[in-house]
Curated annotation (Swiss-Prot):
It comes from Blattella germanica. GO terms for molecular function: hydroxymethylglutaryl-CoA reductase (NADPH) activity; NADP binding. Pathway: Metabolic intermediate biosynthesis; (R)-mevalonate biosynthesis; (R)-mevalonate from acetyl-CoA: step 3/3. Synthesis of mevalonate for the production of non-sterol isoprenoids, which are essential for growth differentiation. The active site is at E528 (charge relay system), K659 (charge relay system), D735 (charge relay system), H834 (proton donor). The chain crosses the membrane at residues 12-32, 89-109, 123-143, 190-210, 344-364. This is 3-hydroxy-3-methylglutaryl-coenzyme A reductase. Its main location: endoplasmic reticulum. GO terms for biological process: coenzyme A metabolic process; isoprenoid biosynthetic process; sterol biosynthetic process. GO terms for cellular component: endoplasmic reticulum membrane; peroxisomal membrane. Gene3D superfamilies: 3-hydroxy-3-methylglutaryl-coenzyme A Reductase, Chain A, domain 2, HMGR, N-terminal domain, Hydroxymethylglutaryl-CoA reductase, class I/II, NAD/NADP-binding domain. Residues 365-443 are annotated as: Linker.
């Protein structure tokens, strides 16, 4: 019930921002202009008689410390906001702070009867008590919206979630701080009064002005080119914000309610006592109370006079008593202004602190240090510092001159001398390149061990290039194949042998792709023109409604082949392995080989006296072929104990099936089985894809379904899924050869909506063989692309989730590519686009000169 009330309040503020803002500003102006007289505060709130002797050095030290803490706390909060990486959150929080300060100042001056000089302490208490965390959470709720219409709903949802907690916290804080106003200590009473006013102002502004202003700012933001709001396109991508994290602890809430009830009784007793005294009919008793408790004269909270200096008295009328003034109003104003501008020791301390923080922020806080990861609904944010580099080299040119790393001496040493040096503690690193080449040529050093022998991977690669150039007479063939400034330590023993360089492949980016409520920019490593542009167009068409994806199966496979003496033993072994208890024993042995590999089932086929056993297991975030091989080997050893006459012919019997087209992968699945769907509105098909629903359906049926069936295709019921799969595989360090099975895809299209003018499109990919750890994913460029997608490495909280997310991204990107290419075919734009984007600048004879893109 309470949540619904707060939701309705939030919906009203977000739906009527102008009305709420104008009403709030009007009330603020009224506080500044209507009835300037101070309120008659209850006893204990500031009417106790004080003497100037109370303001000593200890008071100044305490207040200076409070001011410093307030400044540092405010600096910490805004630095924390800047780490979120969103200029919108930072600006909105700043606006919230400024407006709250303005309302607070108005409240202090009017309702508490304070003068302007009190603000220098009141504002510091306001800064000390303001909490921007809830304001930030509400801003994140709003910024997580994927459209302008969703902003109001998300603001209402945020108010419904945060409102009850903030209301209870405000009540508790006000009552707890209000206890200080019962102390009878003048200074503590005034400070507590400021604090209570700060808490109340923060609450009122947060519940009224802030959500309305938040809605208005985002409503006035211009839309990006992709049709998304500008603040949604330009903000860093943020991870999902779970609502459970914002729900209060019910036990803590009950304790707060009980505490509030008790404190209310204390304050009620005090107010009843004060009211009874105020209504006391006996004037003598009233005077006795005033003499011992309070006086009718109210002084300012802070003394501007030093010891021994008299303050000009102010004429105050309180009841029947009159205090004469011995100075004019102009003299008083001039006096207080001069005292305000006087630089005292506490002012100097605050000024030094502010200057130090400013210098630290400007000169010592780099942008990289302020980048972190934050979670929000459907966004992803990259947390690692960004350092822009050339392609694995520090120089703009990636060509490597073909010359030795060291100049050889005038006369080379003999083979025996070189061997002696090589076997010594100094090692081959003390030899020149020519001497190492001589040892390789003579067979004393294996060519594949050059990096290890010379103890410098880059030098070893350079020497191997020289040997290859000389023995194969390549001349300058390797000049444009770079090899310098690459981290070969991650390559050795993991990715490649006999390395002679690395191959720079252009990496384009398509996106953002609206996948399951997230915006993802997808890297595509390809040398095919039009591919990135076409995929990007498909993503733009899918932006409004987004793509929905699901993982329907997960299991990497390894299919060994074993042989028995006869079919009787083969069939008996097959039936034995299918018994649940025996399978559990096989699974126990299989699972013992890895922390992540878990055998889920086995699929057995008999061919004569041969058994083809397909082990299917989940492998966490790894692609898992090595895990499967190791587990399969141990599991077969256990089966062999029961059937000693079983002969293991091969650990892979092509029943996996790996890197070959196979119906078993298409039917049973391998790796991640993913399904994606999307709805494309009719106006998008016409404006972005330049075609119609009927034309798309006709081309899809005749090309992808009938044409593939005529060709006898297995899993090839698509337009060009392999294009996108391979491009993502190369960019993210997957095994490119596995695009054979991973590209199995069926693309389906059908009319959608009441009038059938919209398009429903889906892609089913049953065998995406993919992982985020191991293999080429450890290489820095490939790891950077995984980082870009937010799936680098293993997922510690939920093993396998990163690999599943990457598989979903692949399928969603394939859907975008399919949609764009099919539209080009339906509209007859395929040849035209390839002639423009996929041709060299040199025109063929008889063709028209190409038109520059900037003039098209």
């Amino acid at each position: 019930m309470v949540g619904r009330l707060f939701r309705a309040h939030g919906q009203f503020c977000a739906s009527h921002p102008w009305e709420v803002i104008v009403a709030t500003l009007t009330l603020t102006v009224c506080m500044l202009t209507v009835d300037q007289r101070p309120l008659g505060l209850p006893p204990g709130w500031g009417h106790n008689c004080i003497t100037l002797e109370e303001y000593n050095a200890a008071d100044m030290i305490v207040m200076t410390l409070i001011r410093c803490v307030a400044v540092l706390y405010s600096y910490y909060q805004f630095c924390h906001l800047q780490k979120l990486g969103s200029k919108y959150i930072l600006g909105i929080a700043g606006l919230f702070t400024v407006f709250s300060s303005f309302v607070f100042s108005s409240s202090v001056i009017n309702f508490l009867g304070s003068d302007v000089s009190d603000l220098k302490d009141a504002l510091f208490f306001f800064l000390l008590l303001i909490d921007l965390s809830k304001a930030t959470v509400l801003a994140q709720f709003a910024l997580s919206s994927r459209s302008q219409d969703e902003v109001k709903h998300n603001i209402a949802r945020g108010i419904a979630m945060l409102g009850p907690t903030i209301t209870l916290d405000t009540v508790v804080e006000t009552l707890v701080i209000g206890v200080g106003m019962l102390s009878g200590v003048r200074r503590l009473e005034v400070l507590c009064c400021f604090a209570c006013m700060s808490v109340i102002v923060n609450y009122v502004v947060f519940m009224t002005f802030y959500p309305a202003c938040l809605s208005l700012i985002l409503e006035l933001s211009r839309s990006g080119e992709s049709g998304r709001p500008a603040w949604h396109d330009k903000s860093l991508i943020i991870k999902a914000l779970h609502e459970e994290d914002q729900k209060p602890n019910p036990v803590v809430q009950r304790v707060k309610v009980i505490m509030s009830a008790g404190l209310m009784l204390v304050h009620a007793h005090r107010w009843v006592r004060c009211l009874s005294i105020a209504l006391w009919p006996d004037l003598t008793s009233l005077r006795y109370f005033c003499t011992h408790c309070d006086t009718g004269v109210s002084y300012s909270r802070w003394s501007f006079a030093s010891e021994g200096e008299e303050l000009p008295t102010v004429k105050l009328v309180t009841g029947d008593s009159v205090v004469n003034s011995n100075s004019t109003d102009d003299a008083q104003l001039h006096y207080y202004i001069m005292r305000w501008l006087t630089v005292s020791a506490d002012h100097i301390v605050i000024l030094i602190l502010l200057l130090a923080l400013a210098v630290k922020f400007v000169f010592f806080e780099t942008r990289d240090e302020l980048t972190t990861t934050r979670g929000m609904d459907g966004w992803v944010e990259v947390s690692s510092p960004v350092e822009h580099k050339y392609v694995q080299t520090e120089q703009p040119s990636c060509s490597a001159p073909e010359q030795p790393l060291e100049e050889p001496p005038a006369s080379n040493r003999s083979i025996d001398e070189c061997l002696s040096v090589c076997k010594s503690d100094v090692g081959a690193q003390a030899l020149s390149d020519c001497e190492v080449m001589a040892l390789v040529t003579s067979g004393h050093i294996a060519g594949y061990q050059l990096e290890k022998v010379v103890r410098n991977p880059e030098r070893g690669v350079g020497i191997r290039r020289q040997i290859l150039t000389k023995t194969a007479d390549l001349k300058d063939a390797l000049d444009n194949l770079p090899y310098k400034n690459y981290d070969y330590l991650k390559v050795m023993g993991a990715c490649c042998e006999n390395v002679i360089g690395y191959m720079p492949v252009p990496v384009g980016v398509a996106g953002p792709l609206n996948l399951d409520g997230r915006l993802v920019h997808v890297p595509l490593a390809t040398t095919e023109g039009c591919l990135v542009a076409s995929t990007n167009r498909g993503m733009r068409a899918l932006m409004r409604c987004g793509v929905t994806s699901r993982i329907v199966a997960d299991g990497m496979t390894r299919g060994p082949v074993v042989r028995f003496p006869n079919i009787d033993r083969a069939s008996e072994a097959m039936l034995w392995m299918q018994v649940p208890y025996n399978f559990e024993q096989i699974k126990k042995n299989f699972d013992s080989t890895s922390r992540f590999a878990r055998l889920s089932k086995i699929h057995i086929r008999v061919a004569g006296r041969h058994l083809f056993i397909r082990f299917i297991a989940t492998t966490g975030d790894a692609m898992g072929m090595n895990m499967l091989s190791k587990g399969t080997e141990v599991a077969l050893a256990y089966v062999q104990q029961v059937y000693p006459d079983m002969e293991i012919l091969s650990l892979s019997g092509n029943f996996c099936t790996d890197k070959k087209p196979a119906a078993v992968n298409w039917i049973e699945g391998r790796g991640k089985s993913v399904v994606c769907e999307a709805i494309v509105p009719a106006d998008i098909i016409k404006s972005v894809l330049k075609t119609s629903v009927q034309a798309l359906m006709d081309v899809n049926i005749t090309k992808n379904l009938i044409g593939s069936a005529v060709a006898g295709s297995i899993g090839g019921f698509n337009a060009h899924a392999a294009n996108i799969v391979t491009a993502i595989f190369i960019a993210t360090g997957q095994d490119p050869a596995q695009n054979v099975g991973s590209s199995n895809c069926m693309t389906l299209m059908e009319p959608w909506g009441e009038d059938g003018k919209d398009l429903y499109v889906s892609c089913t990919m049953p065998s995406i063989e993919i992982g985020t750890i191991g293999g080429g994913t450890v290489l820095p460029p490939q790891a950077a692309c995984l980082d870009m997608l937010g799936v680098r490495g293993a997922n510690e909280m939920c093993p396998g989730e990163n690999a599943n997310t990457l598989a979903r991204i692949v399928c969603g990107t394939v859907l975008a590519g399919e949609l764009s290419l099919m539209s080009a075919l339906a509209a007859g734009h395929l040849v035209k686009s390839h002639m423009r984007h996929n041709r060299s600048s040199v025109s063929t004879s008889g063709s028209e000169p190409s038109t520059p893109a900037c003039k098209s």
